[in-house]
A protein has these predicted regions:
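Primarily recognizes the serine-hydrolase "nucleophile elbow" in alpha/beta-hydrolase
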Residues: 89-179
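Acidic beta-to-alpha connecting loop that harbors the catalytic carboxylate
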Residues: 189-192, 220-222
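C-terminal catalytic histidine-bearing segment of alpha/beta-hydrolase fold enzymes
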Residues: 211-263
Length: 263
């Protein structure tokens, strides 16, 4: 069960998140497209920097968002409470995503029409929940975040989700996605944490405004196959599949989330 949420304004959430989030910015003045990266339930890890480097090499800025710093959730607490669903469900954490979208739109060096969200596991849950909720009362009730614009996801050009959790408590499988942008998902067939074939079925059935979610199936991939430092017995690092995923990330950013006619 989700504990009582602490209300905050968008400006308060932005300030809190930016204290411990990490920005990776290409050389030059821009304006640059940006990808907002949301970590898994274990917290911000080294793998996020490696993915951010891929984005930067493709000419994109990357903000590695830390959802735990301002909430004072330690690594132990994260595994004991967030990973088990006792606190910080995807719909609540979506407030961080909406706040960072607003932050990005305010930066003069960022292209406000080319913002991509990327999420790993719990971060994927967060991204898809954010894309499934209706602006106004539903979002405010879920996030307790106030002062959002009429369209909190204005400027969103795409979503890239890696082994996203879509089980009990996830809104997207029920609501479907509201925002019409390309969505790329990566699912491993040996993922015993969020599911392999079962997750593929959920994503393939998910209602979308137009094109279905593009689900890439990675044969033999476990959960967190891209984490070199993983110590979970359910996880096995696979360098070849990680390289494949990184290539897909760069291609998605440069192709699927291409410049709009308005930018």
């Amino acid at each position: 069960m989700i504990p009582a949420l602490q209300a905050a304004t968008v400006d308060q959430r932005i300030e809190a998140l930016m204290r411990t989030s990490e920005l990776h910015k290409p050389e030059g003045e821009g304006p640059f497209p940006i990808v907002l990266q949301f970590h898994g339930c274990g917290g911000k890890k080294n793998l996020q920097e490696r993915w951010a480097a891929v984005a930067k090499s493709a000419g994109w800025a990357a903000l590695v968002v830390d959802s735990y710093g301002h909430r004072r959730i330690s690594k132990f607490q994260a595994y004991a409470t967030v990973c088990t669903g006792l606190q910080l469900w995807g719909r609540e954490r979506a407030g961080d995503l909406f706040a960072m979208m607003e932050w990005a739109r305010r930066q003069p060096w960022i292209d406000p029409n080319r913002i991509v969200i990327a999420g790993w596991s719990h971060g994927g849950w967060t991204a898809l929940d954010a894309m499934s909720m209706t602006p106004g009362r539903q979002i405010e009730n879920a996030t307790r975040l106030y002062g959002l614009p009429e369209e909190p996801l204005a400027g969103l050009a795409g979503a890239f989700v890696i082994y996203p959790y879509q089980g009990i408590g996830a809104l997207a499988p029920v609501n479907g996605l509201r925002i019409d942008v390309p969505v790329q998902a990566i699912v491993g067939t040996a993922d015993s944490v969020v599911g392999g074939k079962s997750l593929v079925r959920v994503l393939n059935r998910m209602r979308t405004p137009s094109a279905s979610i593009d689900v890439a199936i990675f044969e033999g991939a476990t959960h967190a196959f891209d984490e070199i430092e993983a110590q979970d017995w359910r996880v096995r690092y696979d360098p070849a599949l990680t390289e494949r995923a990184h290539r897909m990330y760069a291609e998605f950013l440069t192709t699927a989330a291409k410049p709009s006619s308005a930018s």
